[in-house]
Amino acid sequence: MTMLLVNGRAYEIDGILFDKDGTLLDFLGLWGAWADCLYERLRAGLAALGIEWRMNEWTELLGTFHAADGPMIGYDRKGPFAMGSIDDVTAILAGKAYRCGLPWNEALELVRSCRIQAAAELDRMRPARALPGLHRFLEQCAQRGLPLAVVTADDTKEARKHLHWLGIDHHFADIIGNDRVSRGKPDPEMARLACASLGIEPSRTALIGDTAGDMQMGKAAGVSLTIGIGAPGGLPGADEVVSDYDALAFPPHGEA
């Protein structure tokens, strides 16, 4: 048993589950770069087929916000870009390409090709940035032997790679992506699988995430504490809301 202090309040836990994007790493820094590349590849691909590109018609489908000259500057935390899987995003964009006149098979092929190109550009840039206070908090967890796992809508291989870029992958006993479950967030399967992997009960587990989907998954799985991070104005389903990891702490050794 470990005592976790959140906003000065104490909770007894045996482990922590973390969402990845927007929770461990800065969402906009990583996925903004990916989206910018993806949209540009889509624009070029459609232009080659004689299809006019109206950016707002595409971005509003995913819930991404952009500057007048194009770069992504924000996103809807309730939207598919924030909460959906890569396959969700692919299906939404392919549906739009189909409505633009492409046969479904060609629409899927175009979006998948653009997605692969965007991922390759991300590998070149490595734009991942840790949230403030994360490294300190993970080290404190390690000092207490607290088991940790990641539960993400991203694919497991990609998630592991992003955490490796940050130099934090070794902190997690397991990383569970959307490809390892039959039903992704907000279904509780991912959280329950993570708890089983760590050998802990959901009722003794904290979950940290940045979307309502994370909180819904945690509640459905029966975790004892849901913590919303970086969510101004609160987050539905969160027991506690913090701006960053500086609001999380542990009592000095010997006091827990």
Model regions: which residues?
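Asp-based, Mg2+/Mn2+-dependent phosphohydrolase catalytic module
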Residues: 1-16, 44, 49, 135-142, ...
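Proline-centered loop/turn at the N-terminus of a beta-strand
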Residues: 147-149, 225
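Conserved phosphate-coupling serine/threonine residues in phosphotransfer and NTP-handling enzymes
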Residues: 23, 152-154
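N-terminal helical cap/lid subdomain that shapes the substrate entry/recognition surface
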Residues: 5-6, 11-132, 144
